[in-house]
Amino acid sequence: MIEIKNLSKKFGSHFSLQDINLCLEKDESVIIMGQNGAGKTTLIRSVLGEQIPTFGSVRIAGIDPFKDRSGALSHVGFVPQLPPPIKLSAKELIRYAVVSSGIEEARIVSICEELELDIKEHFKKLFFKLSGGMKQKLLISIAIAKEPDILIFDEPAANLDAKGRESFYKLLQPLQKKRLLIFVSHRMEEIKSLLTRKIEMDLGKAVNDEKLG
């Protein structure tokens, strides 16, 4: 699903990533951990084709995201840690997702409800004016409704309360055996039952890669 070979990213004289080699497969649930500055965000941005590597390569389902980003990202659903300041209403954002990804509005609304968000009550509100938890739940719902092969969550529960996190993790359980799930998170204990693999990063390197369960 995702193949990373000899990936390095240099900013000035500093290597944010150093010789990363990873192969992430379908049916895996992977957590990527590390202190701030360990290289986690740079790794995800490189996988998503947002940052061109200094050395090495990335393939998503065999596609180079730096040459065919739209093709590569058609396999990916991504939920960022900090929701972007989108200046669309909640309804308009959902319509955009429906048109661009061919998903059904009813499916997005249904997933929102599973996360205990009645998004219809907030259709007219601008996305950036929703609460942090509402934004996160809506983005999670859109990503899952897309039914991609790969789901990447960057601290997905950061803006969710305990009940919201519980609903989110429950929602992921049936997806475990169907997709590649990647979590960038410090909350390993909360999602331990979902995980099959742990990757630890430090100073731009993958210093530990182990199977779980």
Enumerate the predicted regions with their spans.
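Conserved structural motif at the start of ABC-family nucleotide-binding domains
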Residues: 2, 17-19
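The feature captures the beta-strand-to-loop junction immediately N-terminal to the Walker
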Residues: 33-35
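Helix-to-loop junction immediately C-terminal to a conserved catalytic motif
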Residues: 48
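Conserved ABC transporter NBD signature motif
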Residues: 56-67, 71-72
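Q-loop/switch helix immediately C-terminal to the Walker
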Residues: 88-102
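Hydrophobic anchor residue at the start of the ABC signature
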Residues: 140
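Catalytic Walker B motif of ABC-type/P-loop ATPase nucleotide-binding domains
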Residues: 151-155
